Each structure stands twice: as structure tokens, then as C-alpha cells.
């Protein structure tokens, strides 16, 4: 909502002998919850850099942490905390900070910046803030270099949005009525004599045009020509204008790290590396330490390097064994790095997400690294520290045990992240068919007329209609989850009636019932499922604090395992949903398959996870809920399929085992970059319910998801004045993902202009949607060249199109 527009029309002349600070607003300026403001200024004269300077807090009666609540733009472009991996905009403090509680977080994500909850400009820096204290840096003050985003001698604009309403921040404080306005002690810009910190800019904005031919198979290379294995066990990758060293390190108890092509200063005296074999197809390297052995097999496979590290515990005790594999530039500059598909140069670490990759790019080439095996993917932390890598800080091995870590390196002769992703997708065999459009709201079909059901289906080309969470509106309890859902008999009947009504009108549309295999809302959950509880380190049951506070009942978490009682309850829940004499639905919508709030359970060990102390010894073992439940989840998928059930999931796979089950899964998109989490599986983004409020914002969301290389599933369901592009989105069998367009076997969808092809000369139909989302009377220009039908689409801003096989 842009209701607060403030014009600060200022012309300032700076000199090289002194810095000039000019207010954009008066001291004490406040921006109300959910509002936005615009400030205009004109820098003139001689200066070295232009800086946005401010002190800010979000009004709150106590220290309560911080959140990404401010969205800044300069001249309509997002203001991020860094321009490239080597050009940081935030000048007065590091990109990351640590609270007194030990939590390490960043000051910005994309163009959204943190503000601390505080009643004044002192509390958060002092001990009175408790675990929320930020002691090492000033949490209120920000100095940001915007030189490259500003035009000298012309009017420039800075825009600020308070994202509180979009985030629904007040919902987090149900027993209070906080105002949450942003309060500025200072809001100004500096013309400084200091030179700008921004150099080596990367133009990530593709030059889209109708005449650009979008035939872009991945720019692979002959791996033997660019990769070599060193005697130290590491690898060298030599690409145009991008030389990289691939190094690995493995912790040892009581000290530092042993390594392959890594810094040897922290290695054990006993650490010995030998290269057993090596030829044009790869090599075998063995590293021997006091407590373990690393047997590395390197294979050159066409366009990539496949690496297996067999880790063997040679002792009769459990050992900690953190490990790290990374890409380091050697005499080259990495201009951009993607972590989990996120290109934000201010992001230095990500963990717990589904896209276990890092990708670095120079001017002419790029290189990616991907974790492959189950444990590596679950434990992976993707990071940037003068190089990009994937590490595990929690890996351990049982006495006499072993485990094989698998990963791969993909050099690309074009600096294109999507080239890397498309090759990996082929190798992972994840280009399976997404059958059709999905939507929540199935219970409403219990009360809808046949005509209303048919209109809705045709308008959105629905193939799947699903219930959401089992909301018991106005009842007690207010929600049902997990095994507790077996007792919601009145909802069973409503769901059954909805399925029957849908089937009578559109038997081709699948009815799905929501399940969650971790959350359970029985008040006596600990007594019902003592063998299945996710527990805290002190042995108490984990209870989600946010849900518990908001809903008013304890949100316990259990996990299914083949040998525990919760798995049996989940099978009974599936039977209830699918059996003809029960609800009788066509399938299951499985929420949060691999994305839940508790990351650890201390009730049992998964065999490979432990908290390690500063000397890499095991401090406490734990079980990752997704490793503990892995076999049971596979069995549950097989149980659903044995009943003929359709299956769709929320969150993409975080293990190769679940990846190979091949059923459509989407990712939620509360942050702009979240569609990238789906890049290594079914590339489906669920709509952002926080920003989609009407048909226009729905169209914006669909375009945004296409810009991230994904197709679209509905979350919010605003009224449609007419059918739009989602009607022609499925079925979709992915072939290639790109920025702004996606290619499938059946169709191509684009939000950018270009000359496109489905790869052959088959006849096609073009569905062209104007900026208002309506089907337009345009078909593009067609020609056939080299056996390929090319379709020129001169899309204007906001337009989208589909090219379908006839």
C-alpha cells in the first residue's frame, strides 16, 4: 500500500575535500505499518561515492529480535546489501551478525533489510536485551553505498516500503496491539570523498528481444579438456577467464582439518595422501588419518566430474568427521555465486533447503557443485567464503563404520546458472510429467452447484482439487493434524460429500485430502506416541512455539519410522482418506514432506549426525527427522500408490531416495528466491499468499515465478474476470528451465520476448496473454529453419505466452 509519499527534492553539491550529509527526512521521522514513502534528491558536483545513511528501529516495548521489514529501491531497482561477491554495499558492518543467543543471521535478504524491535536506540546493544543483544556492531545504523545506482546531476528517487502488512507481523503478537512503525533517528544521504566500494559490476539482466533466438542447450564441455586431478587429491578446473581449485577437508578430533588440495597447516602429522591410480578417465586417491581413511574415486563422465569419498572409521569408537568440498578461484575473479540457486551476493550461507548446489560464474564461464547422496544433502550448508562450497559441520561415523559421500562438479562454458541446472536435472532424471493445475478449496465443493464446479474447473484448467489444513472453524479443537485427524468425523463426512460432488461433475479431476506426517495435535500426544516424539536436547517433547501461541493448542511433532507407532497411525490416515467406504478421495496432498520446523530430535541417533565441539569431538548425537523417517516415507508413498492414489507434496526432495519416487511437489514462495528451491525437481512454485490479493497481483506472481524458471500452482484463489495463462500451463514435462521461460515436451511458457522453438517442426498453437492477463488476438511470426519451427514473440512488458503442440 503506497499511501505515504514524501518528496525530498534536494540538490547538493559535494566536494572532494569533505563529505556532505543531507537529510531525506527530519530526525524522528516515522513510517507507519504497511505504508511506503518516496524521497527524491539530485547529487551534483564532485564526490567519490553516494551513500544512504540511516538509524532505524521498529517501535516495540521491548527487545524482540529483528526481521526483514524494510524494502528499499533506488530509481526503481532493488537495493541489495552487495552488488557482487567482491563488492559489498553495506559499509559500516559485516553482512552477518551474531546475537547473544548465538544465532547468526544476515542484515539483508535481497532488497529486504532488517530492523530491530526496540523502544529506543540503545536497548538492543546492552545486556538488557538478553539473548537479543547485538553487541559487536551497531544494530540501528546502516551506511550503504548506492553510487552506481545514482545519476549525477539528475533527480533520483529512493523508495521504502514497510513490509509489516505483507508479512502480517502483528499476527505474531496476538496478545498485544503493537504499532510497529519504523522510527528513524537519521535518514539521509552522504556525498563522500571516499571512492565507491562498488567495482566489477555484473549485468544479470538478460537482454531479451523478439529477435533473440532462444535455442539454448547447455554449454557443456569435454571434461577431460578442462579438469585434472592433482597428486594432493584435489582437482583443477580451467575454463575461459575462470580457473578454479577444487579442495576438500576433513576434520580430525582434537585439532583442525586434513585435506585434499587444502591448507595443510591444520593437518595431523599422521595425515598421508597417496594417488593410487590415474588416467584420462579419472583417479583413485587415499588419505589416511589417525582415526579414519578417505578413499576417493574420481571419474570423468562426459561433461562432469563424479566423485565418491568413502569415509571409513578405523577406530572402535564413534568419531566426529566434519567435511567440506569447495570451489576456489585461482588468479580469477568470481563475479557471482549462487547458493541453492539464490544469486543474492549478500547471502553467505544457506542450509536446510532442497537445492543442494553452489554455482560460481566469471565473465565467460561458470562451474557448479552438487551434493548427491542422502546424508550429504540433508546436512549440507551451502556457503561463500572467498569461494563457494558445500559442507557438513555435523557428520559423524559409528565405531568401525563407513559411509560414501557422493558429489559432482559441472564446468560450463557459458556463465549461465540455468545451463548447470539443466544438465544436472538430466543426470538426476527429474524431468517427469506434471499432469495438471492444482488448487486448494475442495471442501467448498460440498456446497457448490454442479455449474459452479464446472465453471471453476474450466476457468483454471484444474486437474487436482485438494483440501487444505483440517480447519474446524468455530469448533473445538480449532484444527486437526496428524493422527488426531482420524477423529474428525464431521469433517470426514464433509470431505466425502465434496469428493462425490466433484466426481459427479468432473471425474477427470482428482480429489486430494491433506495429511501432515509430523504435526500431531492430541493434547496427550506424548502418552499416545512415546516412541515417535521429536524431542529437545533435554528430553522434553518439541512443541512449535509460533503455531501453539497462534492456534491456542500444543503443536507436537512426531516422526514416522517403520518400527514406531506413528507410522501405523499415518497408514490408517491414508486408508481413511482413500478407501471407498471412508472419505473415498482420489489421492493425498502431503504437506511439508521434507520441510518442518524442528531440525533435530534427541530421542534416537540416525547414525551420522552429531553436534561437534570446537575440537570436532562428538558433543551430543541426534537424529535428523528426515533421516529418521526416510524409510517410512518411502513405505507410505508405496502404500498410497498401492491403493491407486494420486500424490502431490509440499517441499521438494532433500534426499536422493525421495527424489527417485517421482511425484509432483511444489515449494512455498514466501521469499522471492524460493522458486529456486524447486530447480532440481518438479519446477513448481506455489503462489505467494502474502502478496496475491486480487487478479492483478496474481498475474504479477505468475510472471515472477516464470522469471525464476518455474510453473505455477494456485495458493490464493482471487476471482478471475476471464481465464488466463494457467489454463494452458499443463501437462508439462520439463526439458529446460531458463530465466523468464521454461521449455517442456508439450509446450513452452514465457514471460519475456524472444524467438522460441519446441525443438522440431511440428505445428504449434500460440496463446498470447496481454498485460491484463486476457487472451489476445496475436499469434507471433513463424518460420522453419534447420528442421525447427521458430516462433517470434514480441511480448510487451507484462505480457506472457504459451506455445503448444497441436
PLM ranges: what are they?
Residues 197-248, 255-290, 294, 298-380:
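Polysaccharide-binding surfaces and accessory modules of carbohydrate-active proteins
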Residues 397-404, 625-806:
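Active-site-proximal substrate-binding groove within the catalytic cores of carbohydrate-active enzymes
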Residues 203, 410-489, 500, 507:
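An acidic-aromatic substrate-binding cleft motif
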Residues 494, 498-503, 510-582:
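Active-site-adjacent "subsite" loops/lids of carbohydrate-active enzymes
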Residues 43, 162, 311-315, 750, ...:
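Asparagine-centered strand-capping/turn motif at beta-strand->loop junctions
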Residues 207-208, 244-264, 284-289, 301-306, ...:
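Beta-strand-rich recognition/accessory modules
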Residues 20-208:
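Beta-strand-rich recognition domains
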Amino acid at each position: 500500500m503506497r499511501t505515504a509519499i514524501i518528496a525530498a527534492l534536494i540538490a547538493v553539491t559535494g566536494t572532494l575535500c569533505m563529505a556532505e550529509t543531507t537529510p531525506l527526512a527530519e530526525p524522528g521521522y516515522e513510517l507507519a505499518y504497511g505504508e511506503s514513502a518516496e524521497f527524491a534528491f539530485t547529487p551534483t558536483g564532485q564526490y567519490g561515492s553516494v551513500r544512504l545513511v540511516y538509524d532505524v528501529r521498529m517501535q516495540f516495548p521491548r527487545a524482540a529480535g529483528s526481521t526483514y521489514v524494510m524494502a528499499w529501491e533506488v530509481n526503481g531497482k532493488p537495493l541489495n546489501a552487495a552488488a557482487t561477491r567482491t563488492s559489498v554495499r553495506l559499509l559500516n558492518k559485516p553482512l552477518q551478525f551474531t546475537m547473544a543467543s548465538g544465532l547468526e543471521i544476515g542484515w539483508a535478504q535481497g532488497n529486504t533489510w532488517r530492523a530491530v524491535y526496540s523502544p529506543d536506540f540503545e536497548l538492543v546493544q546492552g545486556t538488557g536485551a538478553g539473548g537479543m543483544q547485538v553487541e559487536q556492531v551497531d544494530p540501528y545504523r546502516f551506511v550503504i553505498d548506492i553510487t552506481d545506482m545514482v545519476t549525477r546531476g539528475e533527480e533520483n528517487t529512493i523508495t521504502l516500503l514497510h513490509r509489516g502488512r505483507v508479512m502480517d507481523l502483528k499476527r505474531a503478537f496476538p496478545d498485544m496491539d503493537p504499532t510497529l512503525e519504523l522510527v528513524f533517528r537519521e535518514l539521509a544521504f552522504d556525498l563522500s570523498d571516499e571512492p565507491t566500494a562498488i567495482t566489477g559490476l555484473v549485468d544479470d539482466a538478460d537482454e531479451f528481444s523478439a529477435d533473440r533466438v532462444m535455442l539454448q542447450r547447455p554449454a557443456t564441455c569435454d571434461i577431460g579438456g578442462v579438469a585434472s586431478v592433482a597428486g594432493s587429491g584435489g582437482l583443477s578446473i580451467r575454463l575461459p577467464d575462470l580457473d578454479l581449485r577444487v579442495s576438500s577437508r576433513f576434520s580430525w578430533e582434537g585439532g583442525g582439518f586434513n585435506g585434499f588440495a587444502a591448507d595443510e597447516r591444520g593437518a595431523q602429522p599422521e595425515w598421508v595422501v597417496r594417488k593410487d591410480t590415474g588416467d584420462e578417465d579419472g583417479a583413485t586417491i587415499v588419505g589416511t588419518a589417525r582415526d579414519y581413511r578417505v578413499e576417493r574415486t574420481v571419474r570423468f563422465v562426459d561433461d562432469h566430474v563424479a566423485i565418491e569419498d568413502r569415509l571409513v572409521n578405523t577406530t572402535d569408537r564413534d568419531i566426529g568427521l566434519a567435511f567440506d568440498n569447495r570451489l576456489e578461484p585461482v588468479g580469477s575473479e568470481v563475479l557471482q555465486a549462487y547458493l541453492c540457486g539464490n544469486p543474492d551476493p549478500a547471502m553467505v550461507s544457506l542450509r536446510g533447503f532442497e537445492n543442494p548446489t553452489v554455482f560460481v560464474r566469471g565473465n565467460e564461464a561458470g562451474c557448479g557443485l552438487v551434493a548427491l547422496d542422502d546424508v550429504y544433502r540433508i546436512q549440507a550448508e551451502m556457503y561463500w567464503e572467498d569461494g563457494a562450497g558445500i559442507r557438513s559441520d555435523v557428520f559423524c561415523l559409528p565405531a568401525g563404520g563407513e559411509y560414501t559421500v557422493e558429489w559432482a562438479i559441472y564446468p560450463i562454458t557459458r556463465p549461465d546458472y540455468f545451463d548447470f541446472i539443466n544438465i544436472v536435472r538430466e543426470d538426476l532424471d527429474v524431468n517427469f510429467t506434471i499432469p495438471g493445475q492444482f488448487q486448494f478449496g475442495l471442501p467448498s465443493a460440498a456446497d457448490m452447484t454442479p455449474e459452479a464446479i464446472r465453471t471453476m474447473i474450466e476457468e483454471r484448467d484444474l486437474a487436482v482439487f485438494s483440501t487444505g489444513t483440517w480447519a474446524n472453524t468455530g469448533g473445538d479443537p480449532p484444527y486437526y493434524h496428524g493422527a488426531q485427524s482420524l477423529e474428525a468425523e464431521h469433517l470426514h463426512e464433509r470431505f466425502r460429500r465434496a469428493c462425490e460432488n466433484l466426481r459427479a461433475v468432473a471425474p477427470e479431476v482428482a480429489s486430494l485430502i491433506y495429511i501432515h506426517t509430523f504435526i500431531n495435535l492430541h493434547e496427550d500426544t506424548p502418552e499416545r506416541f512415546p516412541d515417535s516424539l521429536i524431542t529437545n536436547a533435554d528430553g522434553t517433547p518439541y512443541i512449535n512455539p509460533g503455531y501453539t501461541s497462534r492456534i491456542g493448542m500444543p503443536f507436537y511433532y512426531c516422526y514416522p519410522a517403520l518400527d514406531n507407532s506413528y507410522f501405523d497411525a499415518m497408514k490408517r490416515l491414508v486408508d481413511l482418506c482413500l478407501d471407498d467406504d471412508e472419505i473415498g478421495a482420489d489421492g493425498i496432498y502431503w504437506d511439508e514432506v521434507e520441510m518442518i520446523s524442528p531440525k533435530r530430535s534427541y530421542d534416537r541417533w540416525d547414525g551420522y549426525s552429531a553436534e561437534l565441539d570446537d575440537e570436532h569431538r562428538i558433543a551430543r548425537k541426534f537424529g535428523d527427522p528426515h533421516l529418521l523417517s526416510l524409510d517410512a516415507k518411502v513405505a507410505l508413498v508405496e502404500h498410497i500408490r498401492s491403493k491407486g492414489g494420486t500424490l502431490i507434496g509440499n517441499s521438494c526432495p532433500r534426499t536422493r531416495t525421495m527424489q527417485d519416487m517421482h511425484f509432483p511437489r511444489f515449494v512455498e514462495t514466501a521469499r522471492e528466491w524460493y522458486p529456486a528451491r524447486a530447480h532440481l525437481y518438479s519446477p513448481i512454485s506455489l503462489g505467494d499468499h502474502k502478496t496475491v490479493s486480487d487478479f492483478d497481483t496474481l498475474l504479477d506472481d505468475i510472471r515472477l515465478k516464470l522469471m525464476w524458471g518455474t510453473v505455477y500452482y494456485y495458493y490464493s484463489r482471487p476471482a478471475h474476470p476471464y481465464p488466463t495463462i494457467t489454463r494452458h500451463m499443463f501437462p508439462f514435462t520439463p526439458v529446460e528451465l531458463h530465466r523468464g521461460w521454461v521449455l517442456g515436451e508439450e509446450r513452452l511458457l514465457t514471460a519475456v520476448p524472444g524467438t522460441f522453438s519446441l525443438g522440431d517442426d511440428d505445428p504449434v498453437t500460440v496463446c498470447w496473454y496481454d498485460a491484463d492477463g486476457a487472451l489476445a488476438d496475436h499469434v507471433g511470426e513463424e518460420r522453419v529453419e534447420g528442421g525447427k519451427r521458430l516462433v517470434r514473440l514480441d511480448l510487451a512488458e507484462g505480457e506472457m505466452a504459451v506455445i503448444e503442440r497441436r
